[in-house]
Amino acid sequence: MGNILRKGQQIYLAGDMKKQMLLNKDGTPKRKVGRPGRKRIDSEAKSRRTAQNRAAQRAFRDRKEAKMKSLQERVELLEQKDAQNKTTTDFLLCSLKSLLSEITKYRAKNSDDERILAFLDDLQEQQKRENEKGTSTAVSKAAKELPSPNSDENMTVNTSIEVQPHTQENEKVMWNIGSWNAPSLTNSWDSPPGNRTGAVTIGDESINGSEMPDFSLDLVSNDRQTGLEALDYDIHNYFPQHSERLTAEKIDTSACQCEIDQKYLPYETEDDTLFPSVLPLAVGSQCNNICNRKCIGTKPCSNKEIKCDLITSHLLNQKSLASVLPVAASHTKTIRTQSEAIEHISSAISNGKASCYHILEEISSLPKYSSLDIDDLCSELIIKAKCTDDCKIVVKARDLQSALVRQLL
């Protein structure tokens, strides 16, 4: 085998054996391992890495599926909004056309009316073409072509949407309505009936919207009155296409006075209390009543929700006032003046006896008010009212107080 040379802990084999062996501390050679620099494969670590890779892939697929689901929901929401916008646009177009047709009954048709009608026709034609193209179906088709979570990641998706080029026709349809100014309308009440047509002044006939005259509507007469008080005369229409005579007469309100009989006025019940004992009938600092500018109550308004059976029965259940209001007491006193009614209501509030029926009894006894006034009061209150869990209509005390001041007192 050749000579053996010992040098430290190493043994060098001479001759044919040129192998190197390491010895332990006790002189025994160490166990031979594989190639130097390589580690033994750990099957447990390999299985752990495989499980981690599978978990990462599964999480990626879940995130991708959630993203696709959210995109589909957004597409559906946009489609619903688009359909709602189209419905609203159609309704506004029809309303505008009907409004123009009504206006032409009272004045002559001018070039601006024809221009608006032409614009509406073009807009309807454009919407019809868009509906035929089916833009909504194109969006849904693009959503269907999106890859599923189990499909190939390298697959390309065509999500392009066709866009119409900007042409002169589109520019005509997108004509700005805000830049158009209607002709000037001026009311001349002092002119004779034969000269009433002179109140409408037609502006320039130019089609350019920027050169149109400004729109001004002046409905103030010479005596500075507005509303129905200034319409105490006949209005005649002298247009040749409408030869019928239109007459506006003053309404006689004497027949509607005191329509609520005293026998239907109520007695006070504990459950029908509409006002708390300290609720005023006028808004704190803005005590500016029509009734002699007199404040009713001393403490500020309350936000307490008060049940109002009158609105529940009269408006929602479609019951008449005679059936809603119970029979009044025999000692009910008829009040003739508004100041007396205010004094009675003030005393009732100060004594803590104010109720819904008590207020109606005081108000309906006045010749100035009728069931129509009570309907107006209910119509204003129902805007700010809300329904409770027990199907009762409640109104805040502050809203009720301001409604009484505006509508009745």
UniProtKB/Swiss-Prot annotation:
Residues 71-99 are annotated as: Leucine-zipper. Residues 356-387 are annotated as: c-CRD. GO terms for biological process: cellular response to stress; positive regulation of transcription by RNA polymerase II; response to cadmium ion. Disruption phenotype: Hypersensitive to the cytotoxic metal cadmium. Residues 26-64, 127-156 are annotated as: Disordered. InterPro entries: AP-1-like, bZIP, bZIP_sf, TF_PAP1, Yap1_redox_dom_sf. Gene3D superfamilies: 1.20.5.170, YAP1 redox domain. Chain B (1.10.238.100). A motif (Nuclear export signal) lies at residues 372-379. Residues 46-69 are annotated as: Basic motif. SUPFAM superfamilies: Leucine zipper domain (SSF57959), YAP1 redox domain (SSF111430). The keyword Isomerase does not apply. Residues 43-106 form the bZIP domain. GO terms for cellular component: cytoplasm; nucleus; RNA polymerase II transcription regulator complex. Induction: CAD1/YAP2 expression is at least partially regulated at the level of mRNA stability. Two small upstream open reading frames (uORF) in its mRNA cause increased RNA decay. The translation initiation factor eIF2 counteracts this effect by causing reinitiation at the functional initiation site, thus suppressing RNA decay. Transcription activator involved in oxidative stress response and cadmium resistance. Regulates the transcription of genes overrepresented for the function of stabilizing proteins including the inducible Hsp90-family protein HSP82. Preferentially binds to promoters with the core binding site 5'-TTA[CG]TAA-3'. Activity of the transcription factor is controlled through oxidation of specific cysteine residues resulting in the alteration of its subcellular location. Activation by alkyl hydroperoxides or cadmium induces nuclear accumulation and as a result CAD1/YAP2 transcriptional activity. Belongs to the bZIP family. YAP subfamily. Contains a C-terminal cysteine rich domain (c-CRD), but lacks the N-terminal CRD (n-CRD) found in its paralog YAP1. It probably also contains embedded in the c-CRD a nuclear export signal, with which the nuclear export protein CRM1/exportin 1 may interact in the absence of inter- or intramolecular disulfide bonds (or otherwise oxidized/modified cysteines) within the c-CRD. Homodimer; disulfide-linked, upon oxidation. Interacts in the nucleus with the nuclear export protein CRM1. Interacts with RCK1. One of 8 closely related fungi-specific YAP proteins (YAP1 to YAP8), which all seem to be transcription activators of the environmental stress response and metabolism control pathways and to have similar but not identical DNA binding specificities. Present with 623 molecules/cell in log phase SD medium. This is AP-1-like transcription factor YAP2.
